[in-house]
């Protein structure tokens, strides 16, 4: 198969020869390894490779795009250029039209590096640890299930301006679920890395299943809740995915809208000094430091491909600081351009309530949640969301977990939760249960919410 760099060069040259006013070619070489397990035994494992090619052709101020996944060679990219250019010539002027990004130097983003790959051996340590875990689960009369996966994506970007960029992005995760023999009790832990301490994860499963020995029934109502980093990460992900659109706010469609097409940027949304930010060079969760997209939306533009990304504070010290805009949208609105960044961090100044266990020890009566699931937005104007607890709701009394409780549906807004939080734990590397698949790189604290709205009892188990 033709090397990715040669495919990029061929696409750019083909577009120039076809009379395109500009061109962007992106090639992503993917490599994936995984293992799945259930009923205390491994069930499947595999390794696969992938290639995704995207072409953007510019005609005047219009753009056309084409994307293919699979074995794409020179003939394939020629077909893609022709299709993208035909679409561009037939399209009206693009709302996100802007000059393509000019050449800028960054030796760290080498276009010449060979694609990196993963293979089955990266899972050897996990598989070795699982063998002992399965034995201990059988001895306890418990059942373990879950999966481990590792991806390496090598991205190549080239444009008709002469810009060339490359980036390697590894991503890993291990999810572990334990269930009691009767299936009535369950616990979940996960780590966003392929090399966790599986024994530590396993011990946490056993601790939580021990809590399941005594159960209580809870009714709907408002409860003091310790929301763990996983749940906080999922809610902050939904807030940034759905709520941080600058165009959406100006159109009156989000929680950060104001009358007359204005936005709430600059307004305080929390008395605590929360800072929610994204930064491609944040230690431990580094990510692609330039714009790379095969399609435009109201917030991201194909014209911005290759543009360097720096740190963006979405919320700074309790006030809304930025919304998401591409260059054209930012220019129209007279604000800073702020693209999507593939990581997310929540901190709260000097506030550090310690670990989840530390926060439990300071709780007179409340609930400890494991994670959130089936999170869906109900009202974009308030960022109201509904969802379910999953794999463990625990009753805390006098600083200790005393029983497990039933699952409960919640109705809450992430913005309101930040406003009502009374304690913030130590930010840690975390993995959201629902959105971790899409946003693996997060650092989140646990939050204490004094009046979390549990709207109805769930029969889920």
Listing of model-derived features with the role each one plays in the protein:
Residues 261-461:
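Dual-mode signal for accessory low-complexity, basic/Gly-rich regions
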Residues 1-291, 295-301, 316-317, 400, ...:
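Active-site bordering "gate/hinge" segments
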């Amino acid at each position: 198969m033709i090397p990715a760099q040669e495919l990029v060069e061929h696409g750019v040259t083909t577009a120039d020869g076809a009379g395109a006013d500009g061109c962007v070619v992106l090639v992503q070489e993917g490599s994936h390894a995984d293992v799945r397990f259930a009923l205390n035994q491994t069930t499947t494992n595999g390794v696969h490779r992938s290639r995704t090619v995207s072409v953007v052709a510019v005609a005047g101020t219009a753009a056309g795009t084409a994307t293919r996944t699979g074995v794409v060679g020179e003939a394939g990219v020629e077909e893609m250029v022709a299709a993208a250019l035909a679409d561009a010539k037939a399209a009206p002027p693009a709302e996100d039209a802007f000059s393509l990004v000019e050449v800028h130097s960054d030796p760290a983003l080498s276009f010449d590096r060979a694609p990196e790959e993963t293979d089955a051996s990266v899972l050897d340590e996990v598989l070795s640890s699982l063998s002992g875990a399965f034995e201990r689960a059988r001895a306890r009369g418990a059942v373990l299930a879950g999966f481990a996966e590792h991806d390496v994506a090598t991205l190549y970007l080239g444009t008709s301006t002469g810009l060339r960029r490359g980036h390697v992005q590894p991503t890993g995760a291990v999810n572990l679920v334990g269930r009691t023999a009767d299936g009535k009790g369950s616990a979940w832990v996960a780590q966003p890395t392929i090399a966790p301490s599986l024994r530590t994860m396993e011990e946490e499963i056993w601790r939580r299943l021990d809590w399941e020995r005594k159960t209580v029934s809870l009714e709907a109502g408002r409860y003091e809740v310790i929301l763990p980093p996983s749940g906080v990460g999922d809610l902050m992900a939904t807030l940034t995915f759905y709520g941080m659109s600058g165009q959406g706010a100006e159109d009156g469609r989000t929680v950060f809208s104001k009358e007359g097409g204005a936005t709430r940027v600059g307004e305080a949304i929390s008395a605590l000094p929360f800072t929610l930010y994204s930064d491609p060079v944040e230690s431990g969760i580094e990510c692609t430091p330039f714009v790379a997209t095969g399609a435009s939306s109201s917030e991201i533009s194909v014209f911005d491909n290759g543009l360097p990304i720096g740190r963006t504070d979405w919320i700074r010290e309790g006030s809304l600081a930025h919304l998401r805009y591409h260059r054209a949208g930012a220019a129209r609105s007279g604000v800073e351009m702020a693209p999507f960044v593939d990581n997310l961090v929540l901190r709260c100044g000097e506030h550090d309530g310690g670990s989840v266990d530390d926060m439990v020890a300071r709780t007179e009566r409340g609930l400890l949640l494991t994670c959130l699931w089936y999170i869906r937005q109900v009202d974009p104007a308030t960022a109201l969301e509904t969802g379910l607890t999953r794999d463990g709701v625990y009753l805390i009394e006098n600083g200790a977990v005393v029983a497990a409780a039933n699952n409960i549906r919640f109705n809450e807004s992430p913005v309101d939760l930040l406003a009502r939080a009374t304690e913030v734990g130590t930010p840690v590397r975390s993995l959201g249960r629902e959105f971790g698949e899409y946003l693996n790189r997060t650092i989140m604290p646990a939050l204490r919410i004094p009046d979390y709205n549990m709207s109805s009892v769930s029969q889920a188990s």
